[in-house]
């Protein structure tokens, strides 16, 4: 893609990845405008948030390359949309992914409404790539070629972030560019150190994008409080303790249980009776699933039927992820009356309702979309 005649907005987070994005664009003779999206809490004295340091880093990098930086306050929209989604899901016993929805609703959504609509392209530091092609279509007997843009994986399987982008809309993907998506993380670090970027040695952020050092359970507790209930051993029906709220636990969880006689892992939640079921390992298969349904499938570029052609009797050949890991699991995808059924090539630990199952082609190259797991 020729970028020379494009108006480009760069989303700077204060981290090394988006900073190298700016360097890469400036190196090509471009002068994009930079934006820092404010989504963190306002109560700085109550929340141990790193947003102030993030903004300082973003400011320093933008000034280094002579680009203007504008702070875009998306705080209210984040808490109205992403936080509400998260709390509704966890209260219902599901396992949501706030970062997936942040990309769709905030970084490529609200930002576009406020500023991004003035730009041809929006550049971010995501580890992802894109491909463009044209397909022939006929409308009202007129034939034409329609351009398509595919979301594709990064060559760095550990850092690949296509799973976090699998819910964005096609029009959002059309405007997105990922200038470091073809690089390995080590290469990005080397560029940052060579260019003496202020955040070259800064650690990567972990967990939900704005929380910083805030504990996720404290974030949940702020909105939902605590609701104690029984913890029951699945195999024996024996009560082994109490939990402080089902929303503090996820299916497949092994750590941080706080019960004696372990190890334990969470296998089921009864939201109506407020019971947490755990297994001591008598029947470890209770924590594994090989087939599971997904609903509300969101296709990125084309409907799945067009990606694969006619449905096969054995289902569509795919690879998939249910969490942010380097592994792409082979399987098949079978259309059903109200969604799809995923058949995994092997049993998977910790399949939980509310998780996004991200679907890729059989070579785990193109990301085709994602759906929410239902059990």
Language-model-derived ranges and their functions:
Residues 123-129, 135-140, 144-375:
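AMP-forming adenylation/ATP pyrophosphatase catalytic core
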Residues 1-166, 193, 266:
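ATP-dependent adenylation/nucleotidyltransferase module used to activate substrates
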């Amino acid at each position: 893609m020729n970028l020379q005649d494009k108006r480009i907005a760069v989303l700077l987070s204060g981290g090394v990845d988006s900073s190298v994005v700016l360097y890469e664009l400036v190196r090509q003779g471009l002068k994009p405008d930079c934006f820092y999206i404010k989504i963190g809490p306002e109560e700085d004295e109550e929340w141990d948030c790193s947003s102030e340091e993030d903004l300082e880093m973003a400011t320093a990098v933008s000034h280094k390359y002579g680009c203007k930086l504008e702070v875009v306050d998306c705080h209210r929209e984040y808490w109205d949309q992403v936080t509400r989604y998260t709390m509704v899901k966890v209260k219902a016993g599901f396992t949501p992914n706030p970062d997936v929805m942040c990309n769709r609703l905030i970084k490529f959504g609200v930002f576009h409404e406020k500023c991004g609509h003035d730009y041809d392209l929006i550049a971010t530091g995501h580890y992802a790539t894109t491909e463009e092609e044209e397909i022939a279509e006929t409308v009202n007997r007129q034939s034409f070629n329609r351009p398509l843009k595919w979301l594709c994986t990064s060559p760095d399987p550990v850092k690949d972030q296509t799973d976090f982008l699998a819910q964005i809309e096609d029009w959002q993907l059309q405007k997105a560019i990922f200038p470091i998506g073809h690089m390995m993380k080590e290469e990005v670090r080397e560029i940052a150190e060579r260019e003496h970027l202020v955040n070259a040695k800064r650690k990567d952020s972990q967990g939900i994008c704005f929380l910083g050092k805030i504990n996720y359970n404290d974030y949940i507790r702020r909105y939902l409080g605590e609701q104690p209930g029984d913890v029951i051993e699945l195999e024996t029906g024996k009560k082994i303790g109490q939990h402080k709220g089902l929303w503090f636990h996820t299916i497949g969880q092994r750590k941080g249980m706080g019960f004696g006689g372990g190890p334990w892992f969470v296998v089921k939640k009864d939201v109506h009776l407020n019971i947490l079921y755990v297994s001591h390992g008598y029947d470890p298969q209770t924590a594994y699933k090989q087939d599971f349904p997904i609903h509300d499938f969101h296709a990125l570029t084309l409907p799945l039927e067009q990606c694969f052609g006619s449905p096969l009797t054995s289902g569509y050949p795919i690879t998939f992820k249910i969490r942010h890991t380097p592994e792409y699991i082979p399987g098949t995808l079978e259309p059903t009356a109200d969604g799809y059924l995923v058949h995994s090539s092997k049993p998977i630990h910790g399949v939980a309702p509310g998780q996004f199952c991200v679907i890729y082609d059989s070579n785990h190259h193109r990301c085709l979309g994602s759906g929410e797991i239902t059990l």
